[in-house]
Amino acid sequence: MTIRYPNGKRYNQASQPHKTPIKKHTYSNRGMSLEEELNETNEYYLTHNIACVHKKPTPLQIVKVDYPARSAAVVKEAYFKQPSTTDYNGVYKGKYIDFEAKETKNKTSFPLQNFHLHQIEHMKQVIAHNGIAFVIIKFTLFDELYLLDAKHIIAFWNRQNTGGRKSITKEEIVEHGSLLSCGYHPRIDYIRVLDTVYFS
């Protein structure tokens, strides 16, 4: 169909240059992060009435917000209200559980600088009140996960503070920790290890 102007001339649509979509490099399909895997695991435990464990929210003080559109708000500036303690907490078989999740690309050790003093103090307090505190450590290059009781983390932290090494060797983690199995549902079955280590 030909379209014409009132003066009879033909309308020629201005040819617009063909835009090739810019490919965005995404790494989302390379694998889930440890946090995502644990969140999925905890969702599985909750929906199957196995345990009630949640990720703790990070307490933030929002200072500046921009509104580029009416329905969108973009936080431009925020500060931590207080130091966060550990990543996850909840209840399993009537016991309070509290744990931190850490990843490392190191092959032979886990650096203690990944912990902060307030996290160590928090784990000590959990243990003092008969709670269960532990750390899940992932060696990403080997795709291996270990559950390590907080008493060992505290001992290694104290060793560091008395002039000892500033990391935990992988051999020490293998010796004192428990290897976690990964699957489909749940993704990281840490409850099975809790049953063996704390409830047997």
UniProtKB/Swiss-Prot annotation:
It holds the Pfam family RecU. It is an enzyme of class 3 (hydrolase). It comes from the Bacteria. One of its GO terms (cellular component) is cytoplasm. InterPro entries: Resolv_RecU, Restrct_endonuc-II-like, tRNA_endonuc-like_dom_sf. The record marks 102 as: Transition state stabilizer. Its cofactor is Mg(2+). Mg(2+) binds at residues 85, 87, 100, 119. Signal peptide: none annotated. Belongs to the RecU family. Endonuclease that resolves Holliday junction intermediates in genetic recombination. Cleaves mobile four-strand junctions by introducing symmetrical nicks in paired strands. Promotes annealing of linear ssDNA with homologous dsDNA. Required for DNA repair, homologous recombination and chromosome segregation. This is Holliday junction resolvase RecU. It comes from Bacillus thuringiensis (strain Al Hakam).
